[in-house]
A protein has these predicted regions:
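Conserved N-terminal beta-strand and adjoining loop/helix that marks the start
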Residues: 1-23
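Residue-level preference for beta-strand/loop junctions
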Residues: 5, 34, 87-89
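Short, well-ordered beta-strand micro-motif
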Residues: 13-15, 27, 92-96, 115
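Conserved Nudix-box catalytic region and its N-terminal flanking loop in Nudix hydrolases
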Residues: 20-61
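Short aromatic/basic micro-patch
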Residues: 39, 87, 113
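Active-site segment of metal-dependent pyrophosphate-handling enzymes
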Residues: 60, 64-100
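NUDIX/MutT-family hydrolases
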Residues: 92, 103-135
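Charged phosphate-binding loop/patch that engages nucleotide di/tri-phosphates or the phosphate backbone
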Residues: 127-153
Length: 153
């Protein structure tokens, strides 16, 4: 029987510029697994860390940013990993930052700030597309989901 685990996070970083939402996408370095894959901030949850703490740490490590505001998206990505015969559930976060001055780590070789449609089309995996769509939907809804799921740090 397959195990179900939570060991990684996805976070979609955005900024507001000229009244428009712009998303950050990062291109994986050639020397890393999934080379040249465009993604949001992603990474493993370390021992003793919560998922949201891992998202903040990964944000700082991969981009140099600290979050201005952060919320839990109303979506959990998932995938099956044949190696280890396990199903991964991936918590998804929306993270707002206050500028576009990215400091890349060696994990990525390029970045871009783009509108939602471009970001969505740049991402490859369905889980990524669904995750960023959930964040974008929450940002453009007239309900209280962000208020209800905002993380205080």
């Amino acid at each position: 029987m397959s195990d179900i685990i939570v060991r990684v996070i996805d976070a979609y970083v955005f900024t507001r510029k000229n009244n428009q939402i712009r998303f950050l996408t990062l291109k994986r370095a050639k020397t890393k697994m999934y080379e040249h894959l465009w993604q949001g901030v992603a990474g493993k949850i370390e021992e003793g860390e919560t998922s949201w703490e891992a998202a903040i740490r990964e944000l700082e490590e991969e981009t140099g940013f600290v979050p201005l505001r952060m919320f839990v998206a109303d979506h959990v990505s998932r995938f099956y990993e044949a190696h280890g015969d396990r199903i991964n559930l991936i918590p998804v976060f929306g993270i707002e930052v206050d500028n576009e001055n990215v400091v890349l780590s060696d994990e990525h070789c390029e970045f871009q700030w783009v509108d939602f449609d471009t970001a969505h089309d740049t991402l490859v995996w369905n889980g990524q597309k669904e995750g960023i769509a959930a964040v974008f939907n929450m940002l453009n809804s007239n309900d209280d989901r962000i208020k209800w799921s905002e993380i205080s740090f």
